[in-house]
Amino acid sequence: LEETSDKAVIFAVFQTDIQQLEKAIAEKFGEGSVASYYGKTPQDERQRIIDKFQDPESELRYFISNPQTGGRGITLTEAGTMIFYSNSYDLELRVQAEDRIHRIGQDKSCTYIDLVSENTVDEKILQNLLSKVKISNEVLGEIRNWFK
């Protein structure tokens, strides 16, 4: 996180991970530098968090969420970096999550980082996701060929 000069979105699958990440980031960078956005985030606070994160002048630099809650339907283009602390096996959730920072209006290049250790379930999940991407690309390529 210290190496990112811009804002960052961090996705974690489990609530305990989100809570621990928020605590650690707040201790290192200050309370106002981080916000979490997940199932336990009150509905009336959610838009305020997004608006504050999207404000270039805001001290809020780190937006932590899970893909189920923060991975769809919101724009987070103030971030140029997205970190996947953990993943699920759901490729659609992953693709949707990536698109939160890679949208119309994004003028920065986007960097995606997966935190994965060798010989862990996280490595197997990432391999599974990459396999699904390959299959999806092959199927879509075949469909496109039908219309040529």
Question: Which ranges hold each PLM region?
Answer:
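A conserved SF2-helicase RecA2
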Residues: 89-148
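Residues at the starts of beta-strands that form the adenosine-phosphate
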Residues: 7, 33, 109-111
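Conserved catalytic network of the ASCE P-loop NTPase/AAA+ motor domain
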Residues: 1-3, 52-57, 74-76
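Conserved interdomain hinge at the start of the Helicase C-terminal
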Residues: 1-13
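SF2 helicase motor core recognition
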Residues: 18-22, 46-47, 61-109
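Short, solvent-exposed loop/turn segments at secondary-structure junctions
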Residues: 14-18, 42, 69-70, 88-90, ...
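Conserved helicase ATPase core of P-loop NTP-dependent helicases/translocases
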Residues: 9-11, 19-22, 29-70
